[in-house]
Swiss-Prot record:
GO cellular component, one term: proton-transporting ATP synthase complex
Signal peptide residue numbers: none
UniProt function note: Produces ATP from ADP in the presence of a proton gradient across the membrane. The catalytic sites are hosted primarily by the beta subunits.
Subunit structure: F-type ATPases have 2 components, CF(1) - the catalytic core - and CF(0) - the membrane proton channel. CF(1) has five subunits: alpha(3), beta(3), gamma(1), delta(1), epsilon(1). CF(0) has three main subunits: a(1), b(2) and c(9-12). The alpha and beta chains form an alternating ring which encloses part of the gamma chain. CF(1) is attached to CF(0) by a central stalk formed by the gamma and epsilon chains, while a peripheral stalk is formed by the delta and b chains.
Taxonomic lineage of the native organism: Bacteria, Bacillati, Bacillota, Bacilli, Bacillales
Principal location listed in the UniProt entry: membrane
PROSITE patterns: ATPASE_ALPHA_BETA
Protein name: ATP synthase subunit beta
Residue ranges crossing the lipid bilayer per the database entry: none
GO molecular-function term, one example from the UniProt record: ATP binding
């Protein structure tokens, strides 16, 4: 092992000078350790990752934890390899940090646990699978209008507080309960409280047994937030490549991955580009996203919550992410104000899987008719606001009448929200979803009150609600 010394500390960026011509490779992990000397002192055990070579003997590194207590002249050791994290079944039901150290209260991992480096190249072309298969989520609005693809990348777009994390929790729950699939959850730069709540909720529901969790939260330095997505992805790739699993990989929130990169970029001496983001934004995003894919062995399907700064979709961070996505689920604040949950915008959400050759003719026709009804209703809203419903023709009145029922029927009660709503969650198979909307469009339920359609699963629940309201069915 080659040793060097810390020569400069700039917040989360640390320069290390090595002697006799040894220069660690880019991405190598470098350790700075110092045992605790006094009773009240805490020892230092810091991992740095090489980012740049400066001249013949100095490397500029990014710290994976706080640099408090680091001084010039401290000894630094080149480990000779990138950061490596545990993989395989030992990770299930456990919580890790960016370095793969356990941060839950359970017993330590076995000493012989397999470890893989977090930096690796994407699968080659001949390893990729070209089959398109739909992933059923049991959430009506998603399965009908913007279906997810196995091995695809799905973006969950929305501002603050419109329900991204709740939707992710429901997806983890549904995939584990209905498909028995493995999930990996990477908490990237989000609230520690949310991660804590998610862990306990998943422990209570038993879903945790099928999930590995990795966290680099808001309070951590940018190095940890920038690399924690790769730690989670490495765990997911092992389940895909070595066990042939179809893995769900959640990133909450991919914007924080970009944000962490931009925090470090200026300190690394790079010239900022548009809106102050790092000039390497597209490259960093591509290196992460290209590893998420279906191979001939298994698949990693990624669902990424994407915070949209100031609800501006042209911001470089969300705009760069768009290029990689197969489907988008857009959450709309106006729908939360109307009490429609999940607040998925049925007109703005898209999927390349919504094609007759993939979902079938009937599903495609029903989905398009639902969208055209809602689009017509949206166009009529200005007229209604100015002149009132009475000024509409009979045909338009019927469109509004049905569109409101469709809008409410797109809402659904979630398993993970039972404690807030007091209603049992529902999982709706795609066939049932298509049948329900087809019957609403045919006018079969025009006589039922709109409130009967709120927060239900199958169409039968609407009929039950109507009976409870005293309506003859």
């Amino acid at each position: 092992m080659k040793k060097g010394r810390v020569s400069q500390v700039l917040g989360p960026v640390v320069d290390v000078r090595f002697e006799d011509g040894h220069l660690p490779a880019i991405y190598n992990a470098i350790k700075v350790s110092q045992p605790a000397t006094g009773e009240n002192e805490v020892g230092i055990d810091l991992t740095l990752e090489v980012a740049l070579h400066l001249g013949d003997d100095t490397v500029r590194t990014i710290a994976m934890a706080s640099t408090d207590g680091i001084q010039r002249g401290m000894e630094a050791v080149d480990t000779g390899a990138p950061i490596s994290v545990p993989v395989g079944d030992v990770t299930l039901g456990r919580v890790f940090n960016v370095l793969g150290d356990k941060i839950d209260l359970n017993e330590p991992l076995p000493a012989d646990a397999q470890k893989d480096p977090i930096h690796r190249s994407a699968p080659s072309f001949d390893e990729l699978s070209t089959e398109v298969e739909i992933l059923e989520t049991g959430i009506k609005v998603v399965d009908l209008l913007a279906p997810y693809i196995k091995g695809g990348k799905i973006g969950l777009f929305g501002g603050a507080g419109v329900g991204k994390t709740v939707l992710i929790q429901e997806l983890i729950n549904n995939i584990a309960q209905e498909h028995g699939g493995i999930s990996v959850f990477a908490g990237v730069g989000e609230r520690t409280r949310e991660g804590n709540d998610l862990f306990y909720e998943m422990s209570d529901s038993g879903v945790i047994k099928k999930t590995a969790m990795v966290f680099g939260q808001m309070n951590e330095p940018p190095g940890a937030r920038m690399r924690v997505a790769l730690t989670g992805l490495t765990m997911a790739e092992h389940f895909r490549d070595k066990q042939g699993q179809d893995v769900l990989f959640f990133i909450d929130n991919i914007f924080r991955f970009t944000q962490a990169g931009s925090e470090v970029s200026a300190l690394l001496g790079r010239m900022p580009s548009a809106v102050g983001y790092q000039p390497t934004l597209a490259t960093e995003m591509g290196q992460l996203q290209e590893r998420i894919t279906s191979t001939n062995v298994g698949s990693v399907t990624s669902i990424q919550a994407i915070y949209v700064p100031a609800d501006d979709y042209t911001d470089p961070a969300p705009a760069t992410t768009f290029a990689h996505l197969d489907a988008t689920t857009n959450l709309e604040r106006k729908l939360t104000e109307m009490g429609i949950y999940p607040a998925v915008d049925p007109l703005a959400s898209t999927s390349r899987a919504l094609a007759p050759e993939i979902v079938g003719e009937e599903h495609y026709a029903v989905a398009r008719e639902v969208q055209s009804t809602l689009q017509r209703y949206k166009e009529l809203q200005d007229i209604i606001a100015i002149l009132g419903m009475d000024e509409l023709g009979e045909e338009d009145k019927l469109v509004v009448h049905r569109a409101r029922r469709i809008q409410f029927f797109l809402s659904q009660n979630f398993h993970v929200a039972e404690q807030f709503t007091g209603q049992k969650g529902s999982y709706v198979p795609v066939k049932e979803t298509v049948r329900g909307f087809k019957e609403i469009l045919s006018g079969k339920y025009d006589h039922l009150p709109e409130d009967a359609f709120r927060l239900v699963g199958r169409i039968e629940e609407v009929i039950e609600n109507a009976k409870e309201m005293g309506v003859e069915v």
